[in-house]
């Protein structure tokens, strides 16, 4: 009540922000005349003038009005496009590190040139982030003439480029690229072995186009670089044969047993074995030789089998072909639930992708091991300043504020919106709904209006396509299977009577122009004459006027999405730049959203109204129930994303520590002081194992210490003899004497090969050990994360336990790094400078090969790229052993009882 009164008196926060920026727009407009009067040389010289003023202490905010006026004038001269006042406001919103919500067709790409130009003046680099390589290249090529006219360089980073090309792109004033590529390059840079191999200059300022898609829809998508783990494809096949023998049960009433072997929860996308299911699965596994007689499925050694059963059940009962994935060229390709696009190279994790491959009876790719990872949430929070643009952000304003600290400002449209949004029509069954959609399409086509039909899955788009073919209606289908044709089909989707079926939301980033796109028609001609171009324009103008007179583009939604924002994106395709248009959603009680979240409430309403087959309900109560269901799903998804962030923040803190350590090592030519410090710590810790601090001589284990010193540091020290010969030796002096002996042994090796070679060797060993153990640590963190929910059964807070145990794992990793670095450098004898250079060359080659295969992962997944080659773990190191070579599967000579490859052989 009070807030609504206050809003009437003071205006909303959004209105106040727009009003404040309106004053700056006035100043920019006042400068327009004087800037327009400048000749070409004087206008171009402004960039250097601004840079000089920045160096003298002026701020970007002080330069903003003049810089925006210069960018606007350059746009007029180079591209024939003048920024509207609302576009100037959009530019200010972006410069201030906020999100600008701008409707479809309002010129977001042109708006970005204003803050990009201003912030590029600092020379620190500006990143413009898009959702795919096509848009990155298109936008860079489109805006490059404007930037280059003003003396700024433009680069593009896309997948498949070599390191040199990427370094050049990042060295540019402005760099365009995709969210995936920026994130992967960050990870690759933190796996490099020298500073010269790093591509990025840092994270200064980023403008994220389609910010809702990248920071919200893909927030649950980890970016992971991985290598292969052990092959278990045969096990997936065997388990896949057993799953059809299990009977699905319905969730029981409280206290009642499950009638079946397992239950499925579609909301959380999980499956759970019942008591009878556990017993039956154990019988099946034993019968097929996968479980020892009398063994329990829950024994620690068999948890992997339980994991395989769970993945197979999910593959069969929660993931459907042509909805969640398609099979293409003998591979399972994920379909993005938000856009309907395929995502080649991405794989579900935790064995799910392999289980689906087994289900589809195609080649099973190997599982993988994480080498480096982050999330989009944490990557984009690295930027000093982050901004974004989209047509639909206001519904997620709370999440942008909570997670990223970004405010959303809704920018007014340049022209008022004329689109009509009709109420939803709800039917009892899917068949009735689709028949109503077909009738609507037929009716609209007879009016010579274009129709865009949005579907939630490939399956639905193909079903609708088959119905339209039966009715003899010409149409285009745009889904994950035909995304190569995307831009062309969308460009012509505004022609009179054109019917286009698209999954959500194919063609995003390309406007549907009423009457079709005349520029696309011109582009199809090899060498068009002015007369041909004039004719194409005239024909287009006729079609354009015809469509506007008929009522503009009609958008039909065949299903409500879980997120209102995705529905608004579909609606936003119609009514661009003040054009007329209309939208309508058709629903049924059998739709996923209705069935899982809203069916009972709506069904009761429909029964109360006495609905008959073929009839539709159009009522505010129904719309409210649907909106409530969507809010419920949005809230659940927000909780999932927030929970992911809370868990990943733990790993993120550790990631920062490790990456800073790597950068410090790479930036330093001489790390001998660091080596000396950790050598002292490691020797002291080793001595303490056998001679506890403040203990008496009778408690000392001198033979064990002598053996350990030889094993760990390669020194044969007569400790017992020292003690016998010098009765004054006590715990502290003995510790110092041992350390000195280890140091002396190391110095002797250094004298043989030279200090510079040894310094280089120390760096390479430290980086190699750090990377190897960090990789193992990431795997351990994955395992910890997968099982941490079980702590809840012990009345413990899983998040707190995760933080505590993750810290312990990290502390253990740091201790192991120290120990292994010292052990390796003490056990080797470097021979030649040439061998050091060969080590560096091989390592870079292996890294380059690995980087080429880096892939993004899908939500609820960890990346699995079966072709990635695991980095060689020390096998190329140019050293000669001082001891006899031990087989990897033989017992370790240190006496630990472990296999050599799992103990001291880990780094050799």
UniProtKB/Swiss-Prot annotation:
Q: Do you know which PANTHER family this protein is assigned to?
A: CHLOROPLAST PROTEIN-TRANSPORTING ATPASE (PTHR30612:SF0), SECA INNER MEMBRANE COMPONENT OF SEC PROTEIN SECRETION SYSTEM (PTHR30612)
Reactions catalysed, as given in the entry: ATP + H2O + cellular proteinSide 1 = ADP + phosphate + cellular proteinSide 2
**Chain sites annotated for binding Zn(2+):** 892, 894, 903-904
Textual note on the cofactor: May bind 1 zinc ion per subunit.
Question: Which Pfam families does the protein's record reference?
Answer: P-loop_SecA, SEC-C, SecA_DEAD, SecA_PP_bind, SecA_SW
State the oligomer form and interacting partners.
Monomer and homodimer. Part of the essential Sec protein translocation apparatus which comprises SecA, SecYEG and auxiliary proteins SecDF-YajC and YidC.
Keywords in alphabetical order, please: ATP-binding, Cell inner membrane, Cell membrane, Cytoplasm, Membrane, Metal-binding, Nucleotide-binding, Protein transport, Translocase, Translocation, Transport, Zinc
Question: GO terms for biological process?
Answer: intracellular protein transmembrane transport; protein import; protein targeting; protein transport by the Sec complex
- Give start-end ranges for the coiled-coil region(s): none
Q: Which domain of life is it from?
A: Bacteria
Q: Which cofactor does it need?
A: Zn(2+)
- Give residues annotated as binding ATP: 87, 105-109, 511
Name the residue ranges with Acidic residues bias: 862-873
Stretches with biased composition (Basic and acidic residues): 559-570
Give GO terms: molecular function aspect only: ATP binding; metal ion binding; protein-exporting ATPase activity
The residue ranges flagged as biased composition, category Basic residues, are: 898-908
Q: Which organism is it from?
A: Hahella chejuensis (strain KCTC 2396)
Task of the protein: Part of the Sec protein translocase complex. Interacts with the SecYEG preprotein conducting channel. Has a central role in coupling the hydrolysis of ATP to the transfer of proteins into and across the cell membrane, serving both as a receptor for the preprotein-SecB complex and as an ATP-driven molecular motor driving the stepwise translocation of polypeptide chains across the membrane.
List every stretch annotated Disordered.
Answer: 559-582, 841-908
Does the keyword section mention Cell inner membrane? yes
Q: Where in the cell is it found?
A: Cell inner membrane; Cytoplasm
Name of the protein: Protein translocase subunit SecA
Low complexity bias (residue ranges) = 847-856
């Amino acid at each position: 009540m009070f807030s609504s009164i206050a809003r009437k008196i003071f205006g909303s926060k959004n209105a106040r922000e727009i009003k404040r920026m309106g004053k700056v727009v006035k100043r920019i407009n006042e400068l327009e005349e004087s800037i327009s009067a400048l000749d070409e040389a004087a206008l171009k010289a402004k960039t250097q003038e601004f840079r000089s003023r920045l160096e003298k202490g002026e701020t970007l905010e002080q330069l903003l009005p003049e810089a925006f006026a210069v960018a606007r004038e350059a746009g007029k001269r180079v591209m024939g496009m003048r920024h509207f006042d609302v576009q100037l406001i959009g530019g200010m919103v972006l410069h201030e590190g906020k999100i600008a919500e701008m409707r479809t067709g309002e010129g977001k790409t042109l708006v970005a040139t204003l803050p990009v130009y201003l912030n590029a003046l600092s020379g620190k680099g500006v990143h413009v982030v898009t959702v795919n390589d096509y848009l990155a290249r298109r936008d860079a090529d489109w805006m490059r003439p404007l930037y280059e006219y003003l003396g700024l360089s433009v680069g593009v980073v896309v997948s498949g480029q070599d390191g040199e090309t990427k370094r050049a792109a990042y060295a540019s004033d402005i760099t365009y690229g995709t969210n995936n590529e920026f994130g992967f390059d960050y990870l690759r840079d933190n796996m490099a072995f020298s500073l010269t191999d790093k591509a990025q200059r840092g994270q200064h300022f980023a403008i994220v186009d389609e910010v809702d898609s990248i920071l919200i829809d893909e927030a649950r998508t980890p970016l992971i670089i991985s290598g292969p783990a052990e092959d278990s494809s045969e096990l997936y096949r065997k388990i896949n044969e057993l799953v059809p023998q299990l009977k699905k049960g319905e969730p029981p009433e409280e206290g009642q047993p499950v009638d079946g072997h397992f239950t499925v929860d579609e909301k959380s996308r999980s499956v759970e074995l019942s008591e009878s299911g556990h017993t039956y699965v154990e019988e099946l596994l034993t019968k097929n030789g996968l479980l020892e007689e009398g063994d329990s499925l829950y024994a620690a050694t068999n948890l992997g089998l339980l994991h395989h059963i769970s993945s197979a059940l999910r593959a069969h009962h929660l993931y459907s072909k042509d909805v969640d994935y398609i099979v293409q060229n003998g591979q399972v390709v994920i379909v993005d639930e938000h856009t309907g696009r395929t995502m080649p190279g991405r794989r579900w994790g935790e064995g799910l992708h392999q289980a689906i491959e087994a289900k589809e009876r195609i080649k099973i790719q190997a599982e993988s091991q994480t080498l480096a990872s982050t999330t989009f949430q944490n990557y984009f929070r690295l930027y000093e300043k982050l901004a974004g643009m989209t047509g639909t952000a206001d519904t997620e304003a709370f999440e942008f504020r909570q997670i990223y600290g970004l405010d959303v400002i809704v920018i007014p449209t340049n022209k008022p919106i004329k689109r009509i949004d009709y109420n939803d029509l709800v039917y009892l069954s899917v068949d009735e709904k689709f028949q109503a959609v077909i009738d609507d399409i037929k009716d609209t086509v007879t009016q010579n209006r274009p129709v865009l039909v949005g579907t939630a899955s490939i399956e639905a788009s193909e079903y609708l396509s088959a119905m339209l073919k039966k009715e003899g209606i010409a149409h285009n289908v745009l889904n994950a299977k035909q995304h190569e044709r995307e831009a062309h089909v969308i460009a012509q989707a505004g022609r009179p009577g054109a019917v286009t079926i698209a999954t959500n939301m194919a063609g995003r980033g390309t406007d549907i122009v009423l009457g079709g796109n005349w520029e696309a028609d011109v582009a199809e001609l090899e060498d068009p004459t002015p007369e041909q171009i004039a004719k194409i324009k005239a024909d287009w103008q006729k079609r354009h006027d015809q469509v506007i007179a008929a009522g503009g583009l009609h958008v039909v939604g065949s299903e409500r999405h879980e997120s209102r924002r995705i529905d608004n994106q579909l609606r936003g395709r119609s009514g661009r730049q003040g054009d007329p248009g209309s939208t309508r959603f058709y629903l049924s009680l059998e739709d996923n959203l209705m069935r899982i979240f809203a069916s009972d409430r709506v069904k009761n309403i429909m029964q109360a109204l006495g609905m008959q087959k073929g009839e539709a309900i159009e009522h505010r109560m129904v719309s409210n129930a649907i909106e409530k269901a969507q809010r419920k799903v949005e809230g659940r998804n927000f909780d999932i994303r927030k929970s992911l962030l809370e868990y990943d923040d733990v790993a993120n803190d550790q990631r920062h520590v490790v990456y800073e350590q790597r950068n410090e090592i790479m930036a330093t030519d001489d790390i001998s002081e660091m080596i000396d410090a950790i050598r002292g710590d490691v020797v002291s810790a080793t001595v303490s194992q056998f001679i506890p601090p403040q203990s008496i001589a009778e408690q000392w284990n001198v033979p064990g210490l002598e053996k350990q010193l030889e094993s760990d540091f390669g020194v044969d020290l007569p400790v017992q003899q020292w003690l016998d010969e010098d009765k004054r030796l006590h715990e502290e002096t003995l510790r110092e004497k041992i350390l000195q002996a280890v140091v002396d042994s190391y110095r002797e090796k250094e004298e043989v090969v030279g200090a510079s070679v040894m310094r280089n060797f120390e760096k390479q060993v430290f980086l190699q050990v750090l990377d190897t153990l960090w990789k193992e640590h990431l795997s351990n963190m994955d395992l910890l994360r997968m099982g941490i929910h079980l702590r809840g059964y012990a009345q413990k807070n899983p998040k707190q336990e995760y933080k505590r145990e993750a810290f312990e794992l990290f502390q253990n990793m740091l201790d192991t790094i120290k120990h292994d670095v010292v052990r390796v450098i003490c056990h080797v004898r470097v021979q030649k400078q040439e061998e050091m250079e060969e080590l560096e060359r091989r390592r870079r080659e292996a890294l380059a090969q690995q980087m080429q295969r880096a892939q993004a992962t899908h939500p609820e997944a960890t990346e699995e790229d079966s072709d990635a080659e695991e980095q060689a773990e020390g096998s190329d190191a140019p050293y000669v052993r001082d001891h006899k070579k031990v087989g990897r599967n033989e017992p370790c000579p240190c006496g630990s009882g472990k296999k050599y490859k799992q103990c001291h052989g880990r780094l050799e």
